[in-house]
């Protein structure tokens, strides 16, 4: 991307990541957390401010807007949508994010001021080796950064601003969409495709510049519920059935050496246990 866009992208990104939008996979509401509206409402306000049309927030928490086409061929062009999600992953704090901008990265390890025992280095993050000379943004070490997907949010907003205010760029109709709850698998409400009103859509969410991913990850979720028998430990012989012990046995028989995220890549499938909660009487995997 040409350097003239970098200041706006950085300003937007650094500002957006400081808004806590962590999703909650135990919540039945949409969005799953009310605080996602803090960013969704802001984005709607900013889209109105830069002159986008048809700006609205749906009842399932998606922000939608239109950038009208420009030029003599705009009416013949397909409508293209660009999407990004505002939520961040549950289980890792997104509150009090303090973005650190490391100017003109010279290589080596980057310090995280609130976690001096942690270092971000090319040894643990090989992509860093390709970014010498770039400005790098990290968290402070106490929280996540939220680059997934506030990088995408910042890019889509900067793109919208440019298309609306640069008369030299001819383009067809563009739709902008920001969604909640992608991190918990609920980012695309069944009503969204019709509301989007686009012929084709691209999600800005990870990957190297210039790369387009045309397949989607697909997964099924299962909750294993174990009910044990809890008795007084002093009289538990031949009576207690510890639900936590059974949960451990279930995990122990899974194919850990061949079908886990850390042992597979590409299109290989895997089984991922990401949470175990419970006590002697009841456990869930």
Residue ranges of predicted features:
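Midchain, well-structured core segments that form catalytic/ion-binding scaffolds
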Residues: 128-129, 134-147, 181-285
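A non-catalytic alpha/beta surface segment that caps or lines the substrate-entry region
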Residues: 28-77, 81-83, 87
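Active-site metal-coordination/substrate-binding segment of hydrolases
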Residues: 73-173, 178
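Structural signal for hydrophobic packing residues in well-ordered secondary-structure cores
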Residues: 17, 21, 47, 51, ...
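Generic structural signal for well-ordered, non-membrane alpha-helical segments
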Residues: 2, 6-9, 32-36, 40, ...
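N-terminal capping segment at the start of a domain
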Residues: 6-34, 138
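Predominant activation on well-ordered alpha-helical scaffold segments within soluble catalytic domains
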Residues: 10, 14, 41-44, 153-161, ...
């Amino acid at each position: 991307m040409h350097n003239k866009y970098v200041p706006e992208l950085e300003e937007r990104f650094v500002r957006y990541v400081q808004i806590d939008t962590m999703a909650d996979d135990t919540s039945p509401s949409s969005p799953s957390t009310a605080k996602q509206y803090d960013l969704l409402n802001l984005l709607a306000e900013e889209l109105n401010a830069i002159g986008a049309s048809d700006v609205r927030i749906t009842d399932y928490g998606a922000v939608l807007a239109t950038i009208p086409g420009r030029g003599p061929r705009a009416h013949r062009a397909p409508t293209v949508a660009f999407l990004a999600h505002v939520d961040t992953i549950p289980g890792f704090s997104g509150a009090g994010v303090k973005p650190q901008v490391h100017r003109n990265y010279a290589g080596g390890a980057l310090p995280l001021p609130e976690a001096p025992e942690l270092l971000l280095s090319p040894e643990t993050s090989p992509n860093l080796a390709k970014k010498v000379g770039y400005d790098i943004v990290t968290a402070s070490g106490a929280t996540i950064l939220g680059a997934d997907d506030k990088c995408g949010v910042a890019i889509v907003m900067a793109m919208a601003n440019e298309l609306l205010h640069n008369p030299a760029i001819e383009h067809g109709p563009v739709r902008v969409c920001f969604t909640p709850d992608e991190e918990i698998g609920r980012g695309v409400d069944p009503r969204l495709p019709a509301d989007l009103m686009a012929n084709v859509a691209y999600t800005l969410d990870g990957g190297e510049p210039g790369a387009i991913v045309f397949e989607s990850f697909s997964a099924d979720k299962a909750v294993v519920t174990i009910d044990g028998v809890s008795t007084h430990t002093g009289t538990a012989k031949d009576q207690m059935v510890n639900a936590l012990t059974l949960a451990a046995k279930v995990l122990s028989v899974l194919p850990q050496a061949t079908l886990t995220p850390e042992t597979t890549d590409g299109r290989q499938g895997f089984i991922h246990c990401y949470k175990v909660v419970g006590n002697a009487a009841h456990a869930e995997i």
